[in-house]
């Protein structure tokens, strides 16, 4: 068993997308990148209040690409590599990446957590997924999943999860995700789940 001690850990808070990369569009035309940032800022503020060290990868609606990236594709690739590098250079990091889901069929809803192959990632994802179901949305019976080709999770070596906070294609869930009240509750669930994980031993995968 390995233990992560809260006092020595930095939670890397990643608001997915940003700048010209808006991510997906909601059913009312809201950009995913903006919602990701709103939720990530709430998560970061709550961690600060609780005394947990954090590092936010972006605090504004910007991309993290290199200035010499000339095309949209090059800028997107450069941006995601920068997120990997910033996470990897953070001592004792645990990565929490915030995203939103989208699907052509409007009926799908519910937050879901994806986890990296790195030790501790699955344990963190299971804790967060359970908390999202029991404390945020009792109708959410989704299970966490191992990330497939998610570049960020595939290339970091620390415990890492990506949280799809909900489906922007579902009108009811999209409306909730835009409200400060729901964002605050979501942030509280994620923060508490993360801190519980940091204070307990986990079995190496």
Kindly give the residue locations of the regions a language model identified:
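Single conserved hydrophobic/aromatic residue that forms the stacking wall/gate
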Residues: 1-3
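Sec-exported extracytoplasmic/periplasmic mature domains
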Residues: 41-52, 88-92, 100, 129-137, ...
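Extracytoplasmic/secreted envelope proteins and their assembly/folding machinery
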Residues: 37-44, 81-84, 122-129, 150, ...
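A generic structural signal for alpha->beta connector loops
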Residues: 51, 110, 140-141, 157
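Catalytic-core regions of hydrolytic enzymes
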Residues: 5-123
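Active-site-adjacent mobile loop/cap segments within catalytic or ligand-binding domains
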Residues: 97, 104, 141-205
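Active-site-adjacent substrate-binding region
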Residues: 120-146
């Amino acid at each position: 068993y390995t233990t992560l001690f809260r006092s020595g850990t930095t939670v890397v808070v990643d608001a997915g997308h940003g700048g010209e990369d808006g991510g997906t569009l909601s059913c009312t035309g809201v950009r995913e990148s903006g919602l990701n940032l709103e939720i990530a800022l709430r998560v970061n503020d709550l961690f600060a209040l609780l005394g947990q060290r954090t590092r936010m990868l972006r605090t504004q609606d910007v991309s993290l690409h290199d200035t010499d990236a000339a095309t949209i594709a090059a800028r997107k690739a450069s941006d995601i590599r920068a997120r990997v590098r910033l996470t990897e250079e953070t001592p004792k990091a645990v990565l929490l990446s915030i995203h939103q889901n989208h699907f052509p069929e409007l009926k799908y809803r519910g937050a879901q957590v994806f986890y990296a192959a790195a030790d501790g990632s699955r344990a963190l994802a299971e804790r967060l997924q359970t908390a999202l179901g029991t404390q945020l949305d009792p109708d959410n019976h989704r299970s966490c999943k191992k990330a497939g080709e998610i570049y960020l999770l595939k290339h970091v070596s620390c415990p890492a999860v990506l949280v799809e906070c909900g489906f922007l294609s579902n009108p009811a869930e999209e409306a909730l995700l835009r409200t400060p009240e729901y964002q605050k509750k979501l942030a509280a669930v994620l923060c508490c789940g993360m801190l519980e994980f940091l204070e307990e031993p986990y079995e190496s995968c």
